[in-house]
Amino acid sequence: MTPLIFVTGGVVSSLGKGIAAASLASILEARGLKVTMVKLDPYINVDPGTMSPFQHGEVYVTDDGAETDLDLGHYERFVRTRLSRKNSVTTGRIYQNVICKERRGDYLGATVQVIPHITDEIRRCIDEATASFDVALVEIGGTVGDIESLPFLEAIRQVRIERGAERTMFMHLTLVPYIAAAGELKTKPTQHSVKELRSIGIQPDVLLCRSEQVIPDSERRKIALFTNVSERAVIGCPDIDVLYGMPLELRRQGLDEIVIDQFKLSGTTSLADLSEWEDVVDAIKHPLDEVTIAVVGKYVDYRDAYKSVGEALKHGGLRQRTKVNLKWVEAQDLEGSDMAALKDIDGILVPGGFGDRGFEGKVLASRYAREQRVPYFGICYGMQAAVVDYARHVAGLEGANSTENDRQSSHPVIALITEWRTTTGEVERRDEKSDLGGTMRLGLQEQRLKAGTLARELYGRDVVGERHRHRYEFNNRYRTQLEDAGLVIAAKSMDDTLVEMIELPREMHPWFLACQAHPEFLSTPRDGHPLFIGFVKASRARKAGGKLLREVCV
């Protein structure tokens, strides 16, 4: 059986369970172990696909088309393992599975209850997602004490009884607040959080203590005494300047050794080689250049809605030792044609979104970038905005729009996809009356790049795969007309039915590229992504007056 590390949180939410868990996973991976991660989310939605970005933040998409929590993005940025829908489990999905089994008669007339039926289904999902790995980390969303989390906590308590301490570990993340008026750290919230956890039947093996500053040894001893946790296993997690430095911090305190010792894996692992993370941290702390990128979006008041976009831009910068400053611009604010927010910036990125609110602002951002020769990178809705702009103002198609926003448009250059193939090769069909949840073109899709294009140059390959999440697409009726007007179709789906990327000729614009996919989902701090690296490089060139002062890379 795969050894399991269960990660819970206490005191308050948003302490960084996902980052802490992913950082530990990266250390274990660096020791030669095959690692995976699972997120258990207590909400009753089947998945976050239809949840508001203002409430939930980004919807992260996996290769197999699962719409998941943004924590899976953290996981994939820290470890090499590519995750799937098995790695994202919600209360809604658990109940959906159990009810389907009950309707089929699988329970043979039994009264279906939380224990054992719901907890058994949770355990089954954990087993399915973690089989064949050396170690798995399972994060339980929410905070200990939340009523929604109780079935998950009961399930992992049962797993501990079944597998024992040599195959399970409980890791609890708590808050140790600093009270400025008293000038001291307070351990009482941590003590109460562990007390709450123990009342459920779970005794933590490791405590990760979040704090604004380093926790003194005297406070660590106090926490260990009152929580029945070894002092060695009370790990401090102080605020750090660089997020990607967390693996180095946890390794310094020996967290991986605690895991190796408890699971008795010392004979199967090597010392952790964290040189890649050291290089990442060094590149972030010591940039040789910097640029300012405007992100023109609909949900900029809640930055988690664009979490992967922001991280991918930073990755693109650190791959060339460039600090990327992000300027968040509300798309609606541009609709009065006041482009002041886009002055003195080095590049414009327009990310994905849904609905007509702010769309005209995105179109105006595309037009501004095109006319002012500012590097432009459009993603998903950002590509659609660029197509609408080009159709209206270059191709002369007055009234051009997306049918998502105007079903009566005289020139629907963007329209609903009614038929496409899924990642498994099955044909999907949709219309305007279809359900919203899980009905988009989702997951990793291959596309063929056109020779001689900027896209082909950046990728260095003829065929690439990118993750998608959209239900509207370039209308093929306008392909020829827009190409005749100068628009370059840089990539198409493998069956030649869908336009995947567009760009402007380089004699018309130094760097104008847009894609229907979401390349941010495949960007990592250690590797970056070709499109983001190229975009940041173009922004550097604009800032330098068209010629880079220095070529740098890590």
Curated annotation (Swiss-Prot):
Limits of the Glutamine amidotransferase type-1 domain: 292-545
Binding site for CTP: 13, 146-148, 186-191, 222
Annotated GO CC locations: cytosol
Stretch list, region Amidoligase domain: 1-265
Pathway of action: Pyrimidine metabolism; CTP biosynthesis via de novo pathway; CTP from UDP: step 2/2
Residues reported to bind L-glutamine: 353, 381-384, 404, 471
Gene3D superfamilies: 3.40.50.880, P-loop containing nucleotide triphosphate hydrolases (3.40.50.300)
The entry's keywords: ATP-binding, Glutamine amidotransferase, Ligase, Magnesium, Metal-binding, Nucleotide-binding, Pyrimidine biosynthesis
A Pfam family recorded for this sequence: CTP_synth_N
Activity regulation annotation text: Allosterically activated by GTP, when glutamine is the substrate; GTP has no effect on the reaction when ammonia is the substrate. The allosteric effector GTP functions by stabilizing the protein conformation that binds the tetrahedral intermediate(s) formed during glutamine hydrolysis. Inhibited by the product CTP, via allosteric rather than competitive inhibition.
Catalysed transformations (reactions): UTP + L-glutamine + ATP + H2O = CTP + L-glutamate + ADP + phosphate + 2 H(+); L-glutamine + H2O = L-glutamate + NH4(+); UTP + NH4(+) + ATP = CTP + ADP + phosphate + 2 H(+)
Active site: 380, 518, 520
The protein's Enzyme Commission number: 6.3.4.2
SUPFAM superfamilies according to UniProt: Class I glutamine amidotransferase-like, P-loop containing nucleoside triphosphate hydrolases
Binding site for Mg(2+): 71, 139
Top-level class of the enzyme under EC nomenclature: ligase
A molecular function GO annotation: CTP synthase activity
Gene Ontology biological-process annotations: 'de novo' CTP biosynthetic process; pyrimidine nucleobase biosynthetic process
Highest taxon in the source lineage: Bacteria
Other comment: CTPSs have evolved a hybrid strategy for distinguishing between UTP and CTP. The overlapping regions of the product feedback inhibitory and substrate sites recognize a common feature in both compounds, the triphosphate moiety. To differentiate isosteric substrate and product pyrimidine rings, an additional pocket far from the expected kinase/ligase catalytic site, specifically recognizes the cytosine and ribose portions of the product inhibitor.
Family membership noted in the UniProt record: Belongs to the CTP synthase family.
Protein role: Catalyzes the ATP-dependent amination of UTP to CTP with either L-glutamine or ammonia as the source of nitrogen. Regulates intracellular CTP levels through interactions with the four ribonucleotide triphosphates.
Subunit structure: Homotetramer.
Record protein name field: CTP synthase
Source organism (scientific name): Xylella fastidiosa (strain M12)
Gene from which this protein is expressed: pyrG
